[in-house]
Regions:
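ABC ATPase NBD coupling module
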Residues: 76-91, 115, 121, 244
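Conserved ABC ATPase "signature" region
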Residues: 122-140
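Conserved beta-strand-loop-alpha-helix hinge in the C-terminal portion
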Residues: 231-254
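Helix-to-loop junction immediately C-terminal to a conserved catalytic motif
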Residues: 59
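Short coil-to-helix segment of the ABC ATPase nucleotide-binding domain corresponding to the Q-loop/switch region
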Residues: 102-111
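Conserved ABC ATPase signature
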Residues: 144-148, 152
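Conserved catalytic motifs of ABC-family nucleotide-binding domains
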Residues: 165
Length: 261
């Protein structure tokens, strides 16, 4: 847990976010962002705007090209093996799940526990079973990812990200390709996490999601930002999003989606 509630969970100053395609280039320039613990941010943008790259940087999986990024007040430029515990306070759900096909669903979920030496094998098994049940994944525990549908793979990836009970949860386009039923499940579940309800009750979880479509995420308690023209543009609340005079925002709002949070 963060010792000082006044310290932002995420703080970026003058950050340039890089991406590796054929060569390294900058996709976001001069980014300033401060996110308090317990906030829920939705970062929208068109394809190749840098959404996934920003989440990779936020998770500590790659460094900024320029600028400073502090995670719970600690400068990530100074992170080494000793700071692994700080990175474990962040859970990451990749778009598509990014599970290991040679492992079962239960084994995939258990993977992060290898970094936690406090867990006995019996305790680890209990944690995995609890998450399997919570995600309705118990019947698929011994199945490999390639043999289940995409929506269940994505749930398993979420369970893996939650196994260490992170303080920050990052999700890359979690509603992509899902119909209303599965999307509604995600919206309800993330809303519970952000409010500190359910199995992870007690403290609201800090959540960042990326999105191609803003409509499903409308909620008065969430904050929104846009990636456009290599810039990170805070939009504010949902009311401010709806009244924003920005052509990209209008495009992301163009097609209403009948989903309920």
């Amino acid at each position: 847990m963060s010792e000082n509630q006044n310290i932002p969970a995420i703080e970026m100053r003058g950050v340039n976010v890089g991406a590796m395609r054929d060569a390294l280039f900058t996709v976001i320039e001069g980014m300033d962002w401060s996110m308090a613990s317990g906030e829920f941010w939705v970062i929208a943008g068109q394809e190749h705007s840098g959404k996934s790259d920003l989440l990779m940087l936020t998770a500590g999986l790659m460094p900024p090209v320029a600028g400073s990024y502090k995670l719970f007040g600690n400068d990530t430029r100074n992170f080494g093996e000793a700071e692994l515990a700080e990175r474990l306070r962040v859970g990451f759900v990749f778009q598509g799940g990014n599970l290991f096909n040679q492992l079962t669903i239960a084994e995939n979920i258990a993977l992060p526990l290898q970094y936690q030496k406090d867990f006995t094998p019996a305790e680890a098994q209990r944690e995995v079973r609890a998450l399997l049940e919570l995600m309705d994944l118990s019947p698929l525990a011994d199945v490999t990812p390639s043999n289940i549908a995409a929506n269940w793979r994505q749930r398993a990836a979420l369970a893996r990200a939650l196994i260490l009970q992170p303080e920050i949860l990052l999700l890359d386009n979690p509603l992509s390709g899902f119909g209303a039923r599965h999307s509604n499940w995600w919206l309800r579940f993330l809303d519970q996490l952000s409010r500190g309800q359910g199995q992870f009750g007690g403290k609201p979880m800090t959540i960042v999601v990326t999105a191609d479509d803003l409509r499903p995420w409308q909620n008065a308690h969430r904050k929104f930002a846009l990636l456009r023209d290599n810039k990170f543009i805070p939009l504010g609340t949902w009311n401010e999003v709806e009244t924003a005079n920005d052509p990209v925002v209008k495009e992301l709002l163009a097609e209403p989606v009948e989903l309920t949070p």
